[in-house]
From Swiss-Prot:
Residues 360-523, 545-570, 594-623, 659-706 have a biased composition (Basic and acidic residues). This is Serine/threonine-protein kinase BUR1. Residues 38-339 form the Protein kinase domain. Belongs to the protein kinase superfamily. CMGC Ser/Thr protein kinase family. CDC2/CDKX subfamily. It comes from Yarrowia lipolytica (strain CLIB 122 / E 150) (Yeast).
Length: 706
């Protein structure tokens, strides 16, 4: 090191890097191995904290107590309560506080998945106060009680002077040895607090919020019952008051089943809290249960502890005050007049020695007494079954039983769920030799004598007698358990597995239209439902053009019946009856400048308006072809209109596009040949038609002027 001469160190050759180093378990300094240092002698206590064993230290031959610390979860590690208890016990040194002698470690076995555990080693104490008070052979005098109470106040006063709260004062945590020394134990809930230490008048001040779920319920003070979190050392003094009262009752004085019941038992003894007896109690969270506890604020401790002296009763009332600020402290309790009156407290060595008594021993003793109190009745002699006399011919019983068939089977599970399950056959005699296949049913009658049965003569009618009702009728030839409907089950039939027509509702009760029903159902529709099935009859060869302005018929948005044999993109309107529609050109649209065959449309090659009235006389209309309709003669007037002229829908020239049609097309379609009276093409004479022209490919034509 710096400033010191270098010491000569023994060096060894450097080991290779891949050299395997043997495993050496780490050592715990300050801890011993429990299997090497201690010999277990038996269990003396158990609880949520762990288990306590009595053991003998091998080196010193003295008896110690091993408190096993339970490791509930490997993820959580060592319990915080155990660490707090070890730290506090290391800081305390007092005759009336249990010391921590050692920490022992038991290694686990990874191959067997056994965890290691830690033991806290403390001196062995022969008794705990709960075991002494539960042992009826232990009789305590007032001097003995005062001696124990003084030692208890000394220990708790030292703890409070060090600014620690025990928070679990109860009879089971107060230990006593054969020398009469009392020691406080179990500091798992103890913790320090900030604030001034208590004196002879006040219990100190605490400004920090602490957990309220502390102290065993039977020893819990009223401020914790009401949910106060800024409690002081007064909670330990309430527990000492409960222990003092337990000296005389030999059992807990407030054994509540719940927090509310605990409050009820406390307030029944010391009175319901008021602003005078417990200032500020109404603002605590637990004050909402005040309607359960009543309104009686009378202190009844003098009636419950009538055998106590006046000073003893005053000392008990001072420890069990509702107001924690006025409750006796450890210093004030030691100076109380109760310890200065006769009989005076004895010295610890003057206390008698009793047999070792712990709380666990009391539990074992009570279980043993409970088992001994249960006297087992002598076993009853098994009586032979009593057969009922039979009046019928005994020769029938000699017949062999018939073969079992389907009638002997129970109904299969799940088949008769809608009916009640058959009940078991009632107890009673069976059919003698034929009943050997029913041993699962009891066949014994109650062990009593049957009354004699006097049958009246057949020729006289006697009223029934009560003793005749006590007798069962003679059994039938074959008894069956009560069944429902068709049991025994019938043989399988096809109709049991196939639906029947009568299981379904009538077909006419369906709510969908008649057209969607089965075609085999040819029954007529009722008049009341006729309007729901009424629909227009469409004929693809009749003139049934749809008109938006036709209000006399109900408007149904139904499409035309589709004909799969027709090209739906070819035309839109239904052709007229008796005439085949004109075929339209197929393939891609012609390019500009190509020669286009005339399909009834009037246009020229260059897409320019015509100069003459008749487009056939123009040179620029040489590619238009003949006009639609019958051919015109070379010379002479045009022929009269045909009796069956082409419809405007065939040429697309006599009407507007299908998506822009209206009633005007109906008015103008009366001249169905598509020409004017003088024979001119109406598509060229009417600017309205020329303005809205579309070719067969859906393209809008240029505007043609006369």
């Amino acid at each position: 090191m710096h400033g010191q001469p270098h010491q000569h160190l023994h060096t060894s050759p450097t080991a290779p890097f891949n050299m395997t180093i043997p495993y050496q378990p780490s050592t715990y300094y300050g801890c011993s191995n429990v299997t090497e240092s201690y010999k277990p002698l038996g269990k003396i206590g158990e609880g949520t904290f762990g288990e306590v064993f009595r053991a003998e230290q091998i080196t010193t031959k003295r008896h110690v107590a091993l408190k096993k610390i339970l490791l509930h979860s490997e993820k959580e590690g060592f319990p915080v309560t155990a660490l707090r208890e070890i730290r506090i016990l290391k800081l305390l040194r007092h005759e009336n506080v249990i010391p921590l002698v050692d920490l022992a470690v038991e290694r686990g076995d990874q191959s067997k998945k056994e965890r290691g555990c830690v033991y806290m080693v403390t001196p062995y104490m022969d008794h705990d106060l709960a075991g002494l008070l539960g042992n009826q052979s232990v009789q305590l005098s007032p001097a003995h009680i005062k001696c124990y109470m003084l030692q208890l106040l000394e220990g708790i006063g030292y703890l409070h002077a060090k600014k620690f709260l025990h928070r679990d004062i109860k009879a089971a945590n107060i230990l006593v040895n054969d020398q009469g020394i009392l020691k406080l134990a179990d500091f798992g809930l103890a913790r320090g607090y900030d604030g001034p230490a208590p004196n002879s008048q006040t219990a100190g001040v605490n400004t920090e919020n602490l957990t309220a779920m502390v102290v065993t319920r039977w020893y819990r003070p009223p401020e914790l019952i009401l949910g106060d979190r800024k409690y002081t050392t007064a909670i330990d003094m309430w527990g000492i008051g409960c222990v003092f009262g337990e000296f005389f009752t030999r059992k807990p004085i407030f054994p509540g089943a719940s927090d509310v019941d605990q409050g009820s038992k406390i307030f029944q003894a010391v009175g319901v809290p008021t602003e005078d007896t417990m200032p500020g109690w109404s603002v605590l969270p637990g004050a909402q249960n005040s309607n359960i506890w009543g309104t009686d604020a009378t202190n009844k401790l003098d009636k419950l502890f009538g055998r106590l002296s006046k000073d003893g009763l005053d000392f008990l009332k001072g420890l069990l005050l509702l107001d924690p600020t006025k409750r006796l402290t450890a210093i004030g309790g030691k100076n109380h007049a109760y310890f200065k009156t006769e009989p005076l407290p004895c010295q610890p060595h003057e206390l008698p020695k009793w047999q070792s008594s712990h709380e666990l021993d009391n539990h074992k003793r009570r279980e043993q007494e409970k088992n001994e109190s249960k006297v087992q009745p002598p076993p009853r002699e098994k009586q032979p079954p009593v057969r009922e006399p039979r009046d019928r011919d005994r020769s029938r019983d000699s017949r062999p039983p018939r073969e079992r068939d389907s009638r002997d089977r129970r109904p299969p599970r799940g088949r008769y769920d809608s009916f009640e399950r058959p009940e078991r056959r009632p107890e009673g005699p069976r059919d003698g030799p034929r009943d050997r296949d029913r041993d699962e049913y009891p066949r014994e009658l109650p062990p009593r004598d049957l009354p004699p049965r006097d049958l009246p003569p057949r020729d006289r009618d006697y009223p029934p007698r009560e003793r005749d009702w006590d007798r069962r009728p003679p059994p039938r030839d074959r008894d069956y358990p009560p069944r429902e409907r068709d049991y025994p089950p019938r043989d399988s039939r096809d109709r049991d597995y196939h639906p029947r027509d009568r299981d379904y509702p009538p077909r006419d009760s369906r709510d969908y239209p008649r057209d969607s029903r089965d075609s085999r159902d040819s029954r007529p529709i009722s008049p009341s439902r006729e309007r729901f099935h009424k629909r227009p009859q469409f004929d693809m060869y009749s003139d049934t053009d749809y008109d938006r302005e036709r209000d006399e018929d109900d408007r149904r948005r139904r499409p035309l019946p589709r004909d799969s044999s027709r090209d739906m993109t070819r035309d839109v309107y239904v052709p007229s009856r008796g005439r085949e529609p004109r075929e339209l050109p197929k393939g891609p649209p012609p390019a500009p400048g190509d020669k286009v065959e005339d399909k009834g449309e009037s246009h020229n090659k260059d897409d320019k308006p015509c100069d003459t009235e008749n487009p056939r006389d123009s040179d620029k209309s040489r590619d238009l072809g003949p006009p639609p309709g019958p051919p015109l003669p070379a010379d002479g007037p045009p022929p009269p209109p045909s009796s069956n002229p082409p419809r405007p829908s065939e040429t697309y020239g006599g009407s507007r596009p299908p998506w822009r049609r209206d009633s005007r097309d109906r008015r103008e379609s009366r001249d169905r040949d598509g020409r004017d009276r003088d024979g001119r093409d109406r598509r060229l004479s009417s600017s309205r038609y020329a303005r809205d022209e579309f070719d067969e490919y859906g393209r809008k034509r240029p505007r043609i002027e006369r």
